[in-house]
């Protein structure tokens, strides 16, 4: 089993890779909205969105599983800590993002309603749904832990049971609630517990080649699913099952390959930095992706490949520069993304 130091670096690497997928996803999605006829951009966007957010949620579950059963904190205290570390940044970033969109509404030709600002507590603005959902997923996990600790304290297959339970809930309940928060829980809690399971599996795999075999197995399972995809597409239930299992399998593959490689090479420091301090990159990239797209369109540059490359590379570079030159050095701005750190509240 690997040391905690190696493990932290590997998780930072995984998060860094996922942030790059987030930026690329926002770039391709924007181009898809603009050029809906382009099959290439649609395909890239569909592939990215099939796994990158479930994998991000699995990372949170992976990290969470290290603190399961921590009796030093009560459930209320744990939820309050997450409120400072996730919910407070969600509110501040949402308000700032709304103000920016409102100020640039004429330029982006998209109406910005005051109602979207008022509804932030129950209806997230665009991409910020992830932070809102993540807080709810943690709350559910804390409450479930509380129940299990009192009713089944010695039950060894809690994570497996919860993963299967929320997989069933995803099929039966997702999209049926008026309140979006319940839909987030129904649709994504299973990936949170998938991350917990991955942590449990990796702790039992002492040999790097056993980890590699897990990656190979995930590829074989996914390949067989792709072969049968056409037969399953006619059945909505089978199609939904394929989509969710694809997200799970790709997530397992990313973890397994990353941990296998961690024993043979050092991950790029800049990618670990993006993963370690992912919040500013996640929050800012949409603005710069959209800005670059507007500038290129006004300059008469409509080539899809060029727009995609410029949007992805440009927004990543701008986010990096702002992070290194401003966010890290000005505590007030850093507070927007990491209030818990500034207030010395642990995660």
Listing of model-derived features with the role each one plays in the protein:
Residues 30-35, 103-107, 171-178, 224-235, ...:
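Juxtamembrane "helix-exit" motif on the non-cytosolic side of transmembrane helices
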Residues 59-77, 178-185, 241-249, 258, ...:
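Cytoplasmic juxtamembrane interface segments
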Residues 121, 144-238:
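Aromatic-enriched alpha-helical transmembrane segments of multi-pass intramembrane proteins
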Residues 60-64, 136, 140-144, 190-202, ...:
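Transmembrane alpha-helical segments
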Residues 41-53, 118-133, 173-191, 225-253:
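Interfacial loop-to-helix transition and helix-capping segments at the boundaries
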Residues 276-290:
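Hydrophobic alpha-helical membrane segments
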Residues 1-167, 265, 273, 299-347:
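Membrane-cytosol interface segments of multi-pass membrane proteins
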Residues 185, 205-272, 287, 302:
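Alpha-helical transmembrane segments and terminal signal-anchor/GPI-anchor hydrophobic tails
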């Amino acid at each position: 089993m690997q040391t905690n130091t190696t493990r932290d670096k590997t998780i930072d690497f995984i998060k860094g890779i996922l942030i790059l997928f987030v930026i690329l996803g926002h770039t391709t999605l924007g181009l898809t909205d603009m050029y809906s006829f382009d099959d290439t951009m649609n395909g890239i966007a569909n592939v990215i969105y099939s796994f990158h957010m479930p994998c991000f949620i699995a990372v949170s579950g992976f990290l969470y599983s290290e603190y399961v059963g921590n009796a030093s904190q009560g459930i209320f205290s744990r939820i309050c800590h997450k409120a400072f570390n996730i919910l407070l940044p969600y509110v501040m970033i949402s308000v700032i993002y709304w103000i920016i969109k409102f100020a640039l509404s004429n330029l982006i030709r998209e109406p910005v309603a005051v109602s979207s600002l008022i509804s932030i507590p129950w209806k997230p603005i665009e991409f910020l749904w992830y932070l809102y959902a993540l807080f709810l997923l943690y709350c559910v996990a804390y409450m479930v832990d509380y129940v299990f600790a009192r009713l089944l304290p010695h039950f060894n297959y809690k994570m497996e049971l919860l993963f299967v339970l929320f997989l069933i809930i995803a099929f039966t309940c997702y999209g049926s609630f008026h309140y979006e928060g319940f839909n987030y829980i129904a649709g994504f809690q299973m990936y949170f517990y998938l991350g917990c399971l991955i942590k449990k599996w990796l702790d039992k795999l002492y040999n790097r080649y056993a980890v590699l075999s897990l990656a190979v197995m995930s590829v074989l399972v996914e390949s067989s699913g792709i072969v049968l995809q056409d037969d399953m597409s006619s059945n909505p239930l089978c199609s939904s099952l394929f989509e969710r299992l694809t997200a799970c399998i790709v997530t397992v593959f990313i973890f397994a390959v990353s941990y296998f490689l961690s024993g043979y090479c050092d991950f790029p420091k800049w990618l670990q930095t993006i993963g370690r301090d992912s919040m500013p990159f996640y929050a800012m990239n949409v603005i710069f992706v959209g800005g670059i797209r507007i500038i290129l369109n006004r300059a008469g540059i409509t080539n899809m490949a060029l727009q995609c490359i410029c949007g992805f590379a440009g927004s990543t570079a701008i986010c990096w520069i702002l992070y290194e030159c401003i966010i890290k050095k000005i505590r007030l701005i850093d507070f927007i993304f990491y209030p818990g750190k500034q207030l010395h509240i642990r995660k």
